[in-house]
C-alpha cells in the first residue's frame, strides 16, 4: 500500500513539472485607441509590431521623428503602436486630443496611438504584462523604467527583442530585425 501511495504522489508531482508559460496570445489583447475605438492586435498578424511607450514632454520625444520615418519606410511589414504613458514624471499631456494634436502637428505621426496606459505597477495594462513577463511572452522578463522603451514582436506575435530608450528607432539594432 505504501508503494502505491508513493507512486501516486510521484505521478501527481509530474504534472507540476509542465511548462508554466502562458498560452495567451498577444493577439488576444485589446487596447483602447486614442480616439476611443478598440485596437484589435489580431489585425496586425503577419506584420512585425513595435510597441513604444511615449510621452510628449520627455527628453526622448524627439524620437517621434524617427518612429514616423521607420513606420513610413517599413509600412508594408511593420506597424508601430505608440502608447502614451504618464508614469514617468507626468510627461504626457492630460487629454487624448492634446496628445494626438501634439503628435500630428509637431511630428506628422500617423501610426496608431492608444489612450494613456500604465506600463508598470498594480494597474499595468495587460499588453505590458505580456511584453514584460517571460511567463506570458515566452522569451524574457523586463521592466519599463522610462519613456520610449521599445518592444519588437514578429509576424507570429512572438517577442523578438527589447530596446532601451536610448536606442533610436532608425538604429541598425532595430532595422536589421525588420
State where each predicted segment sits.
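Sec-dependent N-terminal signal peptides
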Residues: 4-13
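N-terminal "domain-start" segment that seeds a small globular fold
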Residues: 17-42, 62, 126
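Amphipathic alpha-helical repeat scaffolds
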Residues: 33, 53-57
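Conserved helix-turn-beta segment immediately C-terminal to the redox Cys motif
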Residues: 47-48, 57, 61-85, 104-107
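Thiol-based oxidoreductase modules, predominantly thioredoxin-like and allied folds used
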Residues: 53, 77-94, 109-121
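Short, internal strand/loop/helix patches
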Residues: 97-147
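Thiol-/selenol-based redox modules, centered on thioredoxin-like
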Residues: 126-129, 133-178
